[in-house]
A protein has these predicted regions:
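Low-complexity repetitive segments in secreted/extracellular proteins
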Residues: 2, 21-29
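Bacterial N-terminal signal peptides that target proteins for export
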Residues: 2-15
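Compositionally biased, low-complexity repeat tracts
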Residues: 6, 18-19, 120, 184
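Bacterial N-terminal signal peptides
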Residues: 12-24
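Extracellular jelly-roll beta-sandwich "head" domains, especially the C-terminal globular C1q domain
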Residues: 26-205
């Protein structure tokens, strides 16, 4: 009986010693999860990205890192709120403003089409909102316009290799103001969805 008791205590002690180690494994994986093959990814944000004429550089709206297990094609969809603010003053004021959005895969812009017969490959930039206002009047007039609306677009990337990739959505304000006035833009709530697919062998974007 004495031997059996010692044996049971030894087993119980070993089990209790292993419990803290078992708890450490999920915690470590939670902090540094191993990259897994992407099935379908969605990222979103609600922070407002403001762009004005003093900021000529593009801004990054969303970013995600993923891994494809086998060579695949990607369908990339972006939806977001686009706002424009234009201020034009007489006697002869003009304001042009538009926001272009595009996606970059591993630092390279994804074209809308790569087919030379359709004008490709292009730079992948899409106009999400656009405005031109001209004011000509002998009277003193200050015209301020503020609008916001939602838009969406989809890109496609063919034959993406099986490795870790970074996908970014970027935007830039193009503005031209003459006379008195100003122009600004903002992107609000936005969603990026990326889905690996296998299209037909002769598929083209």
């Amino acid at each position: 009986m004495r031997c059996k008791r010692v044996h049971r205590v030894g087993v119980l002690t070993a089990m209790l010693a292993l419990l803290p180690l078992a708890g450490l494994v999920p915690s470590a994986w939670a902090q540094n999860p191993p990259p897994t093959p992407a099935d379908k990814i969605q990222v979103s944000a609600s922070t407002i990205e403001v762009m004005d004429s003093t900021q000529p550089q593009p801004v990054t709206l969303l970013s995600v890192t993923f891994r494809t297990s086998t060579p695949a094609d990607l369908l990339i969809r972006f939806t977001g709120e686009c706002a424009l603010f234009t201020d034009v003053m007489s006697p002869d004021g003009n304001s042009k403003a538009n926001v272009k959005v595009w996606v970059e895969l591993d630092g390279v812009p994804v074209p809308v089409t790569s087919d030379p017969a359709q004008g490709g490959p292009d730079d992948g930039k899409v106009v999400f909102c656009n405005r031109e206002v001209q004011l000509t009047s002998p009277d003193v007039i200050d015209l301020f316009l503020r609008t916001r609306e939602s838009h969406a677009f989809q890109w496609g990337a063919l034959n993406v290799g099986n490795q870790i990739h970074t996908l970014e959505v970027k935007a830039q304000l193009d503005v031209l103001v003459t006379g008195g006035g100003a122009a600004e833009a903002a992107v609000g709530k936005r969603v990026l969805i990326m889905e690996p697919v296998h299209l037909e062998h002769d598929a083209a974007f």
